[in-house]
């Protein structure tokens, strides 16, 4: 065998326990790694073993003894004036030089304030380096620099077809009657000015090309800015989202962030905290609606210290948690996912100044009342006297107003127009069509109107949505579908294709019926009429928005006679033509009792009036409501002896079309079938 193998001047047949021996033709002795770097005895030639050679200058490797200081070149390790590196040797990849001990001073603003978020600086308003966001510094709001790319993404360009613009009848909104009840109601504003709004918010409103506040905004802005609670009812498409975002963001820009509670100070580490402390919370029933509100919040918080976040079920919770960790000042959430994050200890409500319930009646209809009560009353949210609470919706039936007593204090009731009514900008047509003829009539309508605008078709079941969209595709009509069984990614993709016009026909179930603001919808077709007239109102409200005109067509047959009387009233109120077959079916007597809408609540003559102004006690409620809850003369609530008696039938209000599982399990917000 060849002479003993040497590595790094270490002979593999050396031993720590015996004198070195001449090379042997036998097997080399194994030396454990932890013994190889010790000072060696004589080598095979009888000379002292030199120290192991160091790496080449700048190589960055470390081959020195284990107990020696780390460095690069160890060739002169025995010299009295040894230094790990010669002064003129350039640094290597990982090599250390004495000059590196002089570190740069820590900049607390480079990555946001420690423990207070990231790119937006979280609740303390620091700004991530190069993020272009604003800051709150020394008691002042410092807007960030403009970002042309982000402006195009948020606000679009003039005449952008994907952004809603005001239509030819927008000026007619000034003729809509407004009723504000409560004591000391502030005077409305007629323009976006300072005061009361912050200058930075006004600049963002101008970027969005909003020129005049809508009626609900004219009243809600001064009401909220004066610290009052609000219950606002307005027609769909009338600017309710801006009605609560404008005053909340304006106050935030003027007053700055809230301090994180002292007991949370031990949670910080490496400039980031795991628990978020938002100051504003907006709850909405569906994923699509919270995403839409979040997009609006991003617009009007542009270049500010406020960081909006959105959380909802059906999406990756990991990415949502990372978003929250980067800073969360304004949180838009569905109730189920918010309860989940509270249980995980990732969100605290202790700093909440503003609580907004959007589409509040729909959230209660969908079984969210336990989650909402837990969020509002069972967690660490400030009580009703220490926060402002705002309720916005297009309808507020009586029992919802009664529930508001627990959440609101000394509130102003704002009613814009006849709440729950339809816009006169929408031309409503009702066609008598039997079920087996619906497809052929639909094709006739689509051929007649073409695909110049966006057409939204509402059906009652998820199976029908898929079947009808497949049928339209087979007939060479570009169609897609959206319903509760589709994944979040599929739904977002379908909505994006519909908004952009690449797929101008969308078949939808009730998941898209309320709250969604889809620009340039010119035609809404109720392929299946809902069993609740309020759902009909919200479905056709997807067109005729912001003063634009639109067409709504409904397929009616005797299977829909339960809503015939309310449908006739709705058509008359909006000055629409009432077909003779509706009148004849109504005279048959089947339409005068009905279910009264929404499982017994019904619309009734006063469903949109402030209950505090009506004499009568509401089932032992607060004294300010006084009297009895019986129906006023001439109106029927649920058709039951003129009274309210029947409990809300949340499960049966949709004719069983959703099979009990369309909305998932309201009591299990994190279940796999949950779509909120």
Swiss-Prot record:
SUPFAM superfamilies: P-loop containing nucleoside triphosphate hydrolases. Residues 90-100 have a biased composition (Polar residues). Residues 425-586 form the Helicase C-terminal domain. Residues 114-133, 590-605 have a biased composition (Gly residues). The lineage of its organism: Eukaryota, Fungi, Dikarya, Ascomycota, Pezizomycotina. ATP-binding RNA helicase involved in translation initiation. Remodels RNA in response to ADP and ATP concentrations by facilitating disruption, but also formation of RNA duplexes. GO terms for cellular component: cytoplasmic stress granule; spliceosomal complex. The Q motif is unique to and characteristic of the DEAD box family of RNA helicases and controls ATP binding and hydrolysis. Its main location: cytoplasm. GO terms for biological process: cytoplasmic translational initiation; negative regulation of cytoplasmic translational initiation in response to stress; positive regulation of formation of translation preinitiation complex; regulatory ncRNA-mediated gene silencing; spliceosomal complex disassembly. Residues 1-144, 587-610, 655-676 are annotated as: Disordered. It comes from Neosartorya fischeri (strain ATCC 1020 / DSM 3700 / CBS 544.65 / FGSC A1164 / JCM 1740 / NRRL 181 / WB 181) (Aspergillus fischerianus). A motif (Q motif) lies at residues 190-218. The gene is ded1. It catalyses: ATP + H2O = ADP + phosphate + H(+). This is ATP-dependent RNA helicase ded1. It is an enzyme of class 3 (hydrolase). A motif (DEAD box) lies at residues 358-361. It is found in: Cytoplasm.
């Amino acid at each position: 065998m060849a002479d003993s193998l040497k590595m790094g001047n270490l002979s593999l047949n050396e031993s720590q326990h015996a004198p070195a021996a001449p090379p042997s033709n036998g097997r080399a002795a194994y030396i454990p790694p932890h013994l190889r770097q010790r000072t060696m005895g004589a080598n095979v030639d009888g000379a002292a073993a030199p120290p192991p050679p160091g790496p080449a200058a700048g190589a960055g490797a470390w081959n020195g003894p284990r107990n020696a200081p780390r460095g690069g070149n160890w060739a002169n390790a025995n010299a009295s004036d040894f230094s790990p590196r010669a002064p003129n040797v350039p640094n290597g990849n990982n090599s250390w030089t004495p000059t590196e001990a002089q570190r740069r001073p820590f900049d607390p603003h480079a990555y946001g304030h420690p423990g207070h978020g990231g790119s937006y600086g979280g609740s303390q308003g620091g700004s991530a380096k190069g993020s272009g966001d604003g800051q709150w510094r020394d008691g002042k709001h410092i807007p960030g620099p403009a970002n042309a790319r982000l402006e195009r993404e948020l606000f679009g360009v003039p005449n952008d077809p994907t952004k809603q613009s005001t239509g030819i009848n927008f000026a007619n909104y000034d003729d809509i009657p407004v009723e504000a009840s409560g004591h000391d109601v502030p005077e409305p504003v007629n323009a976006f000015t300072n005061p009361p709004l912050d200058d930075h918010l006004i600049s963002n409103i101008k970027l969005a090309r909003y020129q005049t506040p809508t009626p609900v905004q004219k009243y809600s802005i001064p009401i909220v800015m004066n610290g009052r609670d609000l219950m606002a009812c307005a027609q769909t498409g009338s600017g309710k989202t801006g009605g609560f975002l404008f005053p909340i963001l304006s106050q935030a820009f003027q007053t700055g962030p809230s301090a994180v509670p002292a007991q949370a100070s031990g949670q910080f580490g490496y400039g980031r905290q795991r628990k978020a402390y938002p100051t504003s919370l907006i709850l909405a029933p569906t994923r699509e609606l919270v995403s839409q509100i979040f997009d609006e919040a991003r617009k009007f918080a542009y270049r500010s210290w406020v960081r909006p976040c959105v959380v909802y079920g059906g999406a990756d919770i990991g990415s949502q948690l990372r978003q929250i960790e980067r800073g969360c000042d304004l949180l838009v959430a569905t109730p189920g996912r918010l309860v989940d994050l509270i249980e995980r200890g990732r969100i605290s409500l202790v700093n909440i100044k503003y609580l907004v319930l959007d589409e509040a009646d729909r959230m209660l209809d969908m079984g969210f009342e336990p989650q909402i009560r837990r969020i509002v009353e069972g967690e660490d949210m400030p009580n009703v006297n220490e926060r402002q609470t705002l309720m916005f919706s297009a309808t507020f039936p009586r029992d919802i107003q009664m529930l508001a007593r627990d959440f609101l204090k000394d509130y102003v009731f704002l009613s814009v127009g006849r709440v729950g009514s339809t816009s006169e900008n929408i031309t409503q047509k009702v066609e008598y069509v039997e079920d087996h003829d619906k497809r052929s009539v639909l094709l006739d309508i689509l051929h007649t109107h073409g695909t110049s605008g966006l057409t939204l078709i509402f059906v009652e079941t998820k199976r029908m949505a898929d079947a009808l969209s497949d049928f339209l595709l087979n007939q060479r009509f570009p169609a897609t579908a959206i319903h509760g069984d589709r994944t979040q990614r599929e739904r977002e993709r379908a909505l994006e294709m519909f908004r952009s016009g690449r797929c101008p026909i969308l078949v939808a179930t009730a998941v898209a019926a309320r709250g969604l603001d889809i620009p340039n919808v010119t035609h809404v077709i109720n392929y299946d009429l809902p069993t609740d007239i309020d759902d009909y109102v919200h479905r056709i409200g997807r067109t005729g928005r912001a003063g634009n005109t639109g067409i709504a067509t409904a397929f009616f047959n005797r299977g829909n006679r339960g809503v015939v009387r309310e449908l006739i009233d709705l058509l008359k109120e909006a000055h629409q033509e009432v077909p003779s077959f509706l009148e004849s079916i109504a005279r048959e007597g089947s339409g005068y009792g009905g279910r009264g809408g929404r499982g017994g609540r019904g619309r009734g003559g006063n469903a949109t009036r402030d209950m505090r102004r009506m004499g009568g006690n509401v089932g032992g409620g607060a004294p300010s409501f006084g009297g009895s809850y019986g129906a006023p003369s001439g109106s029927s609530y649920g058709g039951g002896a003129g009274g309210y008696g029947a409990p809300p039938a949340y499960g049966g209000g949709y004719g069983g079309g959703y099979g009990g599982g369309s909305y998932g399990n309201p009591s299990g917000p994190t279940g796999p079938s949950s779509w909120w």
